[in-house]
UniProtKB/Swiss-Prot annotation:
One of the early assembly proteins it binds 23S rRNA. One of the proteins that surrounds the polypeptide exit tunnel on the outside of the ribosome. Forms the main docking site for trigger factor binding to the ribosome. HAMAP family: Ribosomal_uL23_B. The gene is rplW. This is Large ribosomal subunit protein uL23. It comes from Corynebacterium glutamicum (strain ATCC 13032 / DSM 20300 / JCM 1318 / BCRC 11384 / CCUG 27702 / LMG 3730 / NBRC 12168 / NCIMB 10025 / NRRL B-2784 / 534). Part of the 50S ribosomal subunit. Contacts protein L29, and trigger factor when it is bound to the ribosome.
Length: 101
């Protein structure tokens, strides 16, 4: 397992979608993460950045879409999403109301 010095290199951004808003009520938060990060690294990064306890991490690799333009075909970049479930009794993450120092 390669070590990454800064946990903010692992967590790229929160996913803003209707599904992610719905999952927040169940204490599940969705983030775009680095494609080479594993579940253990994601868990440690979330706990360090937001100061919460993580119960589980599920990841999804999404292949880039094939897009066509006038000159030919191209591909959007592939992404990786992490669905992070917090432990019972843990504080919620306030990711959409301001930045975290």
């Amino acid at each position: 397992m390669a070590t990454i010095a800064n946990p903010r290199d692992i967590i790229i951004a929160p996913v803003v979608s209707e599904k992610s808003y719905g999952l927040m009520e169940q204490n599940v938060y969705t983030f775009f993460v680095s494609t080479d990060a594993n579940k253990t690294q994601i868990k440690i990064a979330i706990e360090e950045i937001f100061g919460v306890k993580v119960a589980s991490v599920n990841t999804v690799n999404r292949a880039g879409k094939r897009k066509r333009s006038r000159t030919g075909f191209g591909t959007r970049k592939a992404t990786k999403r992490a669905y992070v479930t917090l432990r019972e009794g843990s504080d919620s993450i306030d990711i959409f109301n301001g930045s975290v120092a």
